[in-house]
Swiss-Prot record:
Function field: One of the early assembly proteins it binds 23S rRNA. One of the proteins that surrounds the polypeptide exit tunnel on the outside of the ribosome. Forms the main docking site for trigger factor binding to the ribosome.
Family: Belongs to the universal ribosomal protein uL23 family.
HAMAP family for the chain: Ribosomal_uL23_B (MF_01369_B)
InterPro entries assigned: Nucleotide-bd_a/b_plait_sf (IPR012677), Ribosomal_uL23-like (IPR013025), Ribosomal_uL23/eL15/eS24_sf (IPR012678)
Pfam families referenced in this protein's UniProt entry, alphabetically: Ribosomal_L23
Keywords: Ribonucleoprotein, Ribosomal protein, RNA-binding, rRNA-binding
Record gene name: rplW
Quaternary organization: Part of the 50S ribosomal subunit. Contacts protein L29, and trigger factor when it is bound to the ribosome.
GO cellular component: ribonucleoprotein complex; ribosome
Record protein name field: Large ribosomal subunit protein uL23
Species whose genome carries this gene: Teredinibacter turnerae (strain ATCC 39867 / T7901)
GO molecular function: rRNA binding; structural constituent of ribosome
GO biological process annotation, one example: translation
């Protein structure tokens, strides 16, 4: 895989209550990824950027919500979410700025 592509696969972490519980209970990290990313690309990107070993990746497509604006109904974009299961002893800490 192209190194440049690996840097563009991950768009950012998903910070939510459900993601925090997944990190504590199942040693998982949750990321927002580009919509055409594959599981193998996501795994390679996380291993390269965070220097951790990844056991598995599960992905899901999140449908954009329909929102009402002053000009009528609008729709937010669809996006892809990835649950990355880390190996025992590996962890990613998003809260510290290091």
């Amino acid at each position: 895989m192209n190194q440049e592509r690996l840097y563009k696969v991950l768009l950012g972490p998903v910070i939510s209550e459900k993601a925090a519980m997944a990190a504590e209970i199942a040693n998982q990290a949750v990321f927002k990824v580009v919509s055409d990313a594959s599981k193998s690309e996501i795994k390679a990107a996380v291993e390269k950027l965070f220097n951790v070993s990844v056991e598995g990746v599960r992905v899901l497509n999140v449908k954009g919500k329909t929102k009402r604006t002053r000009y009528g109904m609008g729709r937010r974009s669809d996006w892809k979410k990835a649950y990355v299961t880390l190996a025992e002893g590996s962890e990613i800490d998003f809260e510290s700025g290091e």
